[in-house]
Amino acid sequence: MKKYLALALIAPLLISCSTTKKGDTYNEAWVKDTNGFDILMGQFAHNIENIWGFKEVVIAGPKDYVKYTDQYQTRSHINFDDGTITIETIAGTEPAAHLRRAIIKTLLMGDDPSSVDLYSDVDDITISKEPFLYGQVVDNTGQPIRWEGRASNFADYLLKNRLKSRSNGLRIIYSVTINMVPNHLDKRAHKYLGMVRQASRKYGVDESLILAIMQTESSFNPYAVSRSDALGLMQVVQHTAGKDVFRSQGKSGTPSRSFLFDPASNIDTGTAYLAMLNNVYLGGIDNPTSRRYAVITAYNGGAGSVLRVFSNDKIQAANIINTMTPGDVYQTLTTRHPSAESRRYLYKVNTAQKSYRRR
């Protein structure tokens, strides 16, 4: 599957950063490649269902880290929204040993997404001296987990005290669930504050907006992927927003997957795209608050789709927006935008940004 993850996605200039298929116009080649990638993901899901059983499909997403090992018989699932880590196995022999190994590796994995293939069962997770989950999880004694000895002891405790099993009619599934600390979201956000501040100064984009976008897109999951092949913390698509940013910076081609999986590069690219939306594509909107609402919505659904809410003529659309109050612009975008996802997106990001502004 790995060789298909870099499928070329050719899209219009004004397409969004994280959208699945929305844009100003449809390019036939882009549609074909997007459909091809979607088909491949469907096949991957079908294979997982054949192995694990009906309604047991779990696949990596923007806010879900999912890694399969042991010929797809063991998986680690971190739900960054709920703050839970679930390790499961259907191994018929020594299931506890499979769980123990997966628990230790998950607790001690690093934060280099480019080194891990989430669509294969290759055991490519390396134990890090600075685990990504350090501080986001504590053991049964309330201590954070950095070293293999503590992780091993915690794994033994979990297997003795929290091991569960269930049958789905096809398999017996053994599992252990670990709850992350209550402020796990803030712990992850803190890792990237320096990068956010640097990008904010470089492009003139408010730190609170960058953080709100990151929270909404990925819950600060650097391993974030999507069925539209959006990558990393700010869910940047290589061949749309990534290509636009590279072009604006005088670079040819598109950013690589490894580039976008690097947190600093991802934040820089996502922030550069926000600046392009604000200063170029939606620069005709005078009121900064109205323009911010438009930029947020456009990051998800494309600048063209935002303007078409007001008029099919882009210049006229900006003129109409300039006659409206920011409150009316917000109300219009959250009720009249054709995409329900984009309508919800503006609400989520705006709410998150308010919380970061209060800090």
From Swiss-Prot:
GO terms for molecular function: hydrolase activity, acting on glycosyl bonds; lytic endotransglycosylase activity; peptidoglycan lytic transglycosylase activity. It is a lipid-anchor. Coiled coil: none annotated. A lipid is attached at residue 17 (S-diacylglycerol cysteine). Keywords: Cell outer membrane, Cell wall biogenesis/degradation, Lipoprotein, Lyase, Membrane, Palmitate, Signal. Residues 1-16 form the signal peptide. It catalyses: Exolytic cleavage of the (1->4)-beta-glycosidic linkage between N-acetylmuramic acid (MurNAc) and N-acetylglucosamine (GlcNAc) residues in peptidoglycan, from either the reducing or the non-reducing ends of the peptidoglycan chains, with concomitant formation of a 1,6-anhydrobond in the MurNAc residue. InterPro entries: Lysozyme-like_dom_sf (IPR023346), Murein_transglycosylaseC (IPR023664), Murein_transglycosylaseC_N (IPR024570), Transglyc_AS (IPR000189), Transglycosylase_SLT_dom_1 (IPR008258). GO terms for cellular component: cell outer membrane; outer membrane-bounded periplasmic space. Its EC number is 4.2.2.n1. GO terms for biological process: cell division; cell wall macromolecule catabolic process; cell wall organization; cellular response to antibiotic; cellular response to oxidative stress; peptidoglycan catabolic process. A lipid is attached at residue 17 (N-palmitoyl cysteine). Induction: By SoxS. It is found in: Cell outer membrane. Belongs to the transglycosylase Slt family. NCBIfam families: PRK11671.1. HAMAP family: MltC. Murein-degrading enzyme. May play a role in recycling of muropeptides during cell elongation and/or cell division. This is Membrane-bound lytic murein transglycosylase C. It comes from Escherichia coli (strain K12). The gene is mltC.
